[in-house]
Regions:
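Helix-turn-helix DNA-binding elements, focusing on the entry/boundary residues of the two helices
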Residues: 20, 31, 42, 57-60
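A short, Lys/Arg-rich alpha-helix, primarily the initiator
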Residues: 1-26
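Short alpha-helical DNA-recognition segment
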Residues: 28-47
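Recognition helices and adjacent regulatory flanks at domain boundaries
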Residues: 2-10, 31, 62, 75
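DNA major-groove recognition helix of helix-turn-helix/homeodomain DNA-binding modules
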Residues: 55-79
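Short, charged recognition helix plus adjacent turn
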Residues: 72-117
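The alpha-helix within a helix-turn-helix
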Residues: 24, 35, 64
């Protein structure tokens, strides 16, 4: 089965945190409203966004779930390689040679617009 090391999980958490302001912008929500969606306090969202606290894996999966439920943020996390094939294989408990069983529908024209440097 595909595994993610603690270091890989932490890298994903840090990467997602760096994109949270843009994700909130795409959802058109404040830190408070976003916190209510993902089950975190406004101060916790703030320190995660400012890099003063590394989100937990449970917080990562909660935020990723909200992103996956919204077309714009789903495209955004896909375009910025936060939602990857390996992550999906891990979450679905797949072997390395078995692709994830997810149909990720995206608007291809929008992917370049969402990609960050």
């Amino acid at each position: 089965m595909v595994q993610l090391s603690g270091e890989e999980k932490e890298e994903l958490c840090l990467k997602l945190a760096s994109h949270l302001p843009r994700i909130r912008e795409l959802l058109n929500v404040t830190q408070k409203e976003f916190g209510e969606l993902v089950g975190l306090s406004t101060p916790r969202i703030s320190v995660i966004e400012n890099g003063k606290f590394t989100m937990t894996w449970a917080q990562f999966t909660s935020i990723l779930f909200i992103c996956a439920c919204n077309m714009r943020t789903k495209e955004y996390v896909y375009a910025n390689e936060i939602l990857t094939g390996k992550l999906l294989q891990y979450l679905q408990r797949k072997d390395d040679n078995i692709p994830p069983m997810v149909n990720i529908t995206v608007n291809v024209e929008m992917l370049d617009q969402y990609r960050t440097v």
